[in-house]
Amino acid sequence: MIESSQPGTLYVGVSTKMYLGYRDSLDWLAAVRFEVDARPALKAGRVVPFVIPSFPMLPAAGKILAGSPLILGAQNCGWADGPWTGEVSPSLLAELGVGLVEIGHAERRRHLGEDAAMIARKVRAADDAGVTPLLCVGEGSAAGAGVSGAETAAAFVHQQIQEAVDGDWNLASRLVIAYEPVWAIGAAEPASATYVSAVVRFLREMLGAHSPVAGSSLGELPVIYGGSAKPGLLPMLEGVSGLFLGRYAHDAANFGKVLDEALALDAILPEDKFHQGESTRGKFVIPG
């Protein structure tokens, strides 16, 4: 489980999906480790890097990343131990040192039949095992330009989150949300910074109606953006908690560039800047 972070913490992460073979994955993990080690400011924990390699890489990845600020993630999990051939339980992932697990990615929803009930079981099982769910959400098609389109998309994403926690907003407070518009995944360019910022702003307003713990608000839940994300995007976003990178970060140097952008944002933004409805450029608080 990822520990509660300081005010203003940013996430920068990447999944390799199934693009890299075993040897290439080892080389890539070593290169990412080099990029992180070259930035000692990451040790402060205000910018949190994470990597999500394919399942067979997890034991080796744990060794390569040992002693670094990098959080190891998994691309999927089952929802129970026992007779589930081919699945990997969250409890086993925890034993391997996995800190977060991707759940509900659009590709699994579309091609592998993952529905809301299955995703909810996985989210609960991961949380019970002490592994932070990285819940992937996003509208299937562009909802339209302007305020109305962004609000429609936010309402859809809010519903996905509610279904994933089965209405348990206390559980929701322990999630990291990856907002990935399905139409932006694998596209030539990410969704526009203006659109993403507007969707996240509306989503925070909707989540803010839920207060699972006295003194906390789900409007402060970490929401990172994914969907053809690449260097140069993060400084343009407002109210977004970081980036979930894909193919652009398979070049470890690009991962380093985004880490630099996050560290620069952290250096110029005051800790008390995170308030619902304000321009925050990635500021967030994980409710304790």
Question: Where on the chain are the PLM-derived regions?
Answer:
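Active-site loop-to-helix "anion-binding N-cap" substructures in soluble metabolic enzymes
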Residues: 2-288
